[in-house]
Amino acid sequence: MSVTVLLFAAYADALGRPSVDVPLAPGATVREVLDALKRMPGADRLPPSPLVAVNQRYARLSDTVHAGDEVAVIPPVAGG
């Protein structure tokens, strides 16, 4: 199966593109999506601890993804 990962800000900059299709085994989790990104060229520049949304809803690392899902990887937000 495959999911489309939307990359924002520093994530898009590090991987050199705004999105990527990630092949995964059925039953994969959000954590496995992030692990797949960490194996891509440029991953050494990925910020830690992103916010993740699956189909426009915030997700936990343990949530399962399904074929065709849209996974958004968003940098952590800081403010003051």
Predicted regions and their residues:
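Ubiquitin-like/PB1-type beta-grasp interaction modules and other compact soluble beta-rich domains
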Residues: M1-G79
